[in-house]
């Protein structure tokens, strides 16, 4: 795999991305290492236009974002707008926070919510991705949770 096919997820260096100055210094280091793409996640409350400008100044591509559940589900249009600012097609839901993954009713409500958001993404030419973890490989009522998510 070539380095231009790999992106750095900012979540791994989130402690150094909480304000504009630190973020820009971190982005410069990422660029100097040789990366050309990043995934926005775990950064502080920094205006998306400022982040985009920083990336443009350094010739870094924003290939994806990770957004909290509540943002994707309750503020879908805001997330899509941010993707438009970033000239980015992909965002991922990083973790089923506040969802009891042993409760089928909660799982199904979560699936319904992300399907609604996913439909809005699709209508705007964006892709909502799902970042799974080990917990989605558990079974509830004899069905693997991740299979239920993808099936519905």
Regions found by a protein language model. Give the residues of each.
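Active-site acidic/histidine proton-transfer and metal-coordination neighborhood
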Residues: 69-152
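N-terminal pre-domain/capping segments
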Residues: 1-89
């Amino acid at each position: 795999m070539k380095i231009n096919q790999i992106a750095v997820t900012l979540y791994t260096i989130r402690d150094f991305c909480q304000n504009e100055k630190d973020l820009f210094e971190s982005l410069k280091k990422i660029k100097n290492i040789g990366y050309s793409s990043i995934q926005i996640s775990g950064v502080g409350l920094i205006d998306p236009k400022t982040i985009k400008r920083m990336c443009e100044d350094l010739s870094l591509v924003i290939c994806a974002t990770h957004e909290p559940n509540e943002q994707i589900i309750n503020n879908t249009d805001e997330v899509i707008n941010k993707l438009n600012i970033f000239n980015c097609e992909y965002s991922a839901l990083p973790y089923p926070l506040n969802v009891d993954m042993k409760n089928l009713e909660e799982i199904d409500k979560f699936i319904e919510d992300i399907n609604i958001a996913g439909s809005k993404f699709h209508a705007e030419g964006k892709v909502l991705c799902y970042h799974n973890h080990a917990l989605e490989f558990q079974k509830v009522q004899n069905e693997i949770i991740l299979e239920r998510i993808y099936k519905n």
